[in-house]
Design a protein with these regions (language model features):
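Active-site-proximal or metal-binding-adjacent scaffold patches in catalytic folds
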Residues: 1-88, 97-133
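Walker B catalytic acidic pair
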Residues: 93
Length: 133
């Protein structure tokens, strides 16, 4: 099995000065890298991830307990400032997924458990915050 690239290598490859448009082939790769490096592979099942133009947000985590197939869904914007911003947003939504799936919290909020991942994000050169501009 081929080795996956590290997040640092991908950030360097795409750079911080060009726009990044995610696609459905790259997202699972970045998801696996973040899952391994931040969550120690605890997020076994990847939720459904949608890409669409959004107003007022760059990402969104949704939970629907009544859904038959996909009760967890991450929606991300279709265009980002750069690859780093995309990785931060995907990681941010993965923290909400972790809160719901692993910690079994009723609401995936920006609380103490959410910010407990800040050091892990910083180690990867990413920023974990409540609002991204």
């Amino acid at each position: 099995m081929p080795r996956t690239k590290s997040l640092a290598a991908l950030i360097e490859q795409y750079g911080d000065d060009r726009c990044y448009k995610p696609n459905s082939r790259k997202i699972p790769m970045v998801y696996r890298i973040l899952n391994r490096q931040i969550f120690k592979n605890q997020l076994k099942k990847m939720p459904k991830i949608m890409i669409r133009r959004m107003h007022g947000a760059l990402g969104l985590f949704e939970f629907n307990p009544y859904a038959l197939k996909h009760c967890h869904q991450i929606t991300i914007h279709n265009k980002f400032k750069n690859f780093r911003e995309f990785a931060e947003i995907l990681g941010h939504e993965m923290v909400h997924y972790y809160q719901k799936l692993i910690l079994k919290q009723n609401s995936a909020r920006h609380n103490r458990e959410f910010y407990s991942f800040k050091k892990k994000f910083n180690k990867l050169g990413l920023d974990l915050k409540r609002v991204y501009h």
